[in-house]
């Protein structure tokens, strides 16, 4: 988001200024404020770190950029150690206590003593310190459940349970393949639906029925029948299209919007977001891992 904004400001400075576009540059400072708010009680000036898998991770530049913009440490699991009930960072001056970690590592890898024992990315003993309330983790372990696409079907009920209110925006009709009736409908209408694996991301494990061949649909039908819990389906939604420069021409391409929200003492919604664009003509897959791109998003 921040990179796209900088490119547009340099490329079209006059258009940008005349349009009075709301800034997104304060996101790192807002993130830092949120992380500071999460610090354990009685910690006045918390030491904060961004926990990254390392230089070979595809998002390493983002991790490095955010840590620099916030003025906090960028650390890997090998840079941290649990000692005397706290998490410490190894420095040239000895151990330095860490109070908050913005983790960019999946749950399974954050502590080999609790989760995957073969993990070299996390910190042994981290979860014990977390349970004692001596370090804050963002996002908290377990929040990755929201990545399970099946959860989407229950969002209206979740909103109703926690707020006593109805959802403002209706859900896209969603079919959960573990339900016999839903599964029968999905298998009978594969040519009309988008089918997604519950725990895949990046555009993988997905079937766009109207664009798939009969053989591809048959293969997916077999997967659904074998592991119904792992699949959900939705109608094929017509994504918005925007003009996109392709070579020396301007053509329409499908896009979606990924907003950014921070939840600290207050809720911050970034006045912009990441507009992801499918660069392949006719494609509905906007993920960067599948050849997608991104665009700056203006809120006036």
Across the structure, where does each feature detected by a protein language model lie?
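Domain-scale recognition of functional cores that engage charged ligands
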Residues: 1-300
């Amino acid at each position: 988001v921040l990179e796209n904004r900088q490119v547009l400001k340099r490329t079209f400075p006059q258009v940008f200024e005349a349009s009075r576009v709301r800034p997104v540059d304060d996101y790192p400072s807002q993130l830092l404020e949120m992380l500071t708010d999460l610090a354990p009680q009685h910690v006045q000036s918390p030491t904060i770190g961004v926990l990254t898998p390392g230089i070979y991770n595809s998002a390493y530049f983002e991790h490095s950029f955010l840590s620099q913009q916030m003025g906090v440490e960028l650390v890997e699991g090998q840079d941290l150690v649990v000692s005397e009930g706290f998490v410490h960072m190894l420095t040239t001056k000895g151990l330095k206590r860490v109070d908050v970690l913005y983790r960019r590592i999946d749950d399974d890898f954050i502590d080999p003593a609790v989760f995957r024992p073969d993990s070299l990315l996390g910190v042994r003993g981290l979860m014990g310190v977390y349970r004692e309330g001596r370090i804050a983790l963002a996002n908290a372990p377990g929040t990755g459940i929201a990545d399970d696409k099946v959860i989407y079907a229950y969002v209206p009920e979740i909103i109703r349970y926690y707020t006593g209110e109805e959802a403002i925006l209706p859900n896209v009709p969603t079919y959960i393949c573990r339900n016999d009736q839903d599964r029968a409908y999905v298998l009978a209408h594969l040519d009309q639906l988008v089918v997604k694996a519950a725990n895949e991301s990046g555009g993988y494990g997905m079937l766009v029925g109207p664009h798939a061949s009969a053989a591809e649909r048959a293969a997916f039908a077999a997967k659904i029948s074998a592991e119904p819990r792992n699949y959900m389906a939705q109608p094929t939604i017509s994504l918005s299209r925007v003009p996109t420069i392709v070579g020396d021409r301007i053509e329409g391409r499908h896009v979606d919007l990924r907003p950014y929200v921070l939840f600290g003492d207050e809720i911050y919604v970034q006045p912009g977001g990441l507009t992801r664009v499918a660069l392949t003509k006719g494609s509905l897959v906007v993920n960067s891992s599948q050849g997608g791109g991104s665009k700056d998003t203006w809120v006036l």
